Each structure stands twice: as structure tokens, then as C-alpha cells.
Amino acid sequence: LTNTLSANTMAEDVTTMLAGELEFDPPADDYIGVVNVVGTIQEQTQSSVLDTSSGYQHNTTMDYIDNLMDDSDNKGILLYVDSPGGAVYESEELHDKLIEYKETTGRPIWTYMAHYAASGGYMTSVTGDKIYANKNTVTGSIGVIMSGYNMSGLYEKLGIRYVSITSGVNKDSSKLTDEQVAIYQSQVDECYQEFVNIVADGRDMSADQVKALADGRTYTAKQAKANGLIDEIATYQDVMNQMASELGVDEFYTPSSEESILAAIFSKAEKLVPKSEAQILKETAEEKESGVLMYYAEQLQ
């Protein structure tokens, strides 16, 4: 038992060292909290000691917003979005947390869109009382996607035979039937309607007005402004200056989130390790979130 506890404790310590920690140490005076949503909005997992998480950290971001809610010195949020979207679950959870912040505190959220604020990234953005975009921002992509890979040809080539024993005709979807396609389409449609409702509420538009724009396409900043999806086109510094002036608060706070030395070492080591064809296929499938409902904008390669 002692050895098991020691091993578990050591594993937890290693995980902490790899991940690094977010320090919430806000200024002593009034401040605006900067919330960075950069990268794909999804749960972060680690499959190995070399697999260090980077980019958007969902649980850390949610905890940070909770801390801002509880701090009376916080006077608002500047939401910095540079994201093509992500999983339905995490995108909506982040949206709802930001709405909770506004309703609980009565404090404002201003949104600034950087390179990308598409799909789930746009869903996050519409929590802003004011939405600004860089002149080169790509946004929109209001819609839902569920995708997967048909690996049957590859399995046959490799001599692999898939076998499943199920309790119902729709339990196994390895070979999609028309009925199963209809089932998944109904789930996509339900999430799409929720997305439309969120945009309608956030931008004070009717559902029909949103649907006219929500066929999955992306928009430039000028197109987004013309269609009422954003308020203004500006630089990040201009938005900071305007928000500071309007709220009468000069201090902007971003929590420290430095990558640990150990994480940096493992991250570099991972890039030097040759990958097998199986690992490449696995990473490709994970990147596409196979079989998961996504508010995500595909980017041209």
C-alpha cells in the first residue's frame, strides 16, 4: 500500500511539473482581467510522459474566470480570442461560464478577435458586450461538424478484421446505415439550433437573421461588421486603451502560466523521437476529433 501511494504521489508530482501551474496573483488595485482563448477549445489530455499539453487549457481557463468572479477588485474581462473553435461540450461550457461571470458580477466583457475567431471561437466571442476584430480576422463559420474516418480499406490491406458484438442495431456504427446517418444528423441539427440561439441572444438578432449567415462559411472582418457579427474593426492596443478609458481602470492582468523547465525539455525531446505510421494515423484521427460533435472551422492547409 505504501509503495502504491508513493508511486501515485510521484506520478502526480511529475504531471504537475510537466503541466506547470497557473498563478492567480492579481494587482492590489482595480484591474481588468485578460482571458486568452488561443487554440482549439477542447479538453486537454496526455497519453504519455512526452505528450505535454500546449495551447488552450480548458480547466485552467474555467478556474481563472471563477477567480475573477470572486475578486471585487476585478472590474471586467478583456477576452482575447484566437481560435478556430473546438468541441461542442467545451465551447458551450466556456460560453456559459462567461455568461455566468456577467450575470453574477454585472461587470462587462469586451472581446478582441485576433487571427481566427471562428465557429466555437465565435460562440465564445459573442459573450462580449462589445466585439472588436483585427482588420485581417477570419470569423463566422457558425455551424456544427461531426466527422470520422472509414478505415476499412486500410484494415483489409493490413489483414485486420473488425469484430463487434452489440446489444442493438445502432450500437455499432463502424459501417453507417441510413438510419444511423439520420440519428447523427439529428444531433448535429440540435447543436446547430443551440448555436443559432446563442448568436441571436448575443448579437440581438432574430434566429432567422442568424440562419441566413450560418451556413458554415467564414467572414472577413469587414463582412462580419456589415452583417452585424462584430461591432468595430480595431487593433488590440486601441481596444485596451478604449476599455481602460471607459471603465476608468488602467491595469490589465494576465495570470502567469510559464511552461515548466521539465515540460520544455520533454516537449523538445518528443519532436526528436521518430513516429511510427500507426502513431501518425492516431494523431491525425485525434486532431480531427473523430466522431465528436464540433463547433470547428476547417483551415486550409
Language-model features and meaning:
Residues 1-110, 116-117, 130-132, 148-301:
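N-terminal organellar transit peptides
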Residues 92, 124, 144:
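Short amphipathic alpha-helical segments
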Residues 119-121:
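Short, conserved loop-to-beta-strand elements that form functional interface hotspots
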Residues 123-124, 154:
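Hydrophobic/aromatic ligand-binding patch that stacks against planar heteroaromatic rings
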Residues 124-125, 224:
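Hydrophobic/aromatic residues within transmembrane alpha-helices
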Residues 127-146:
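Zinc-dependent metallopeptidase catalytic helix centered on the HExxH motif
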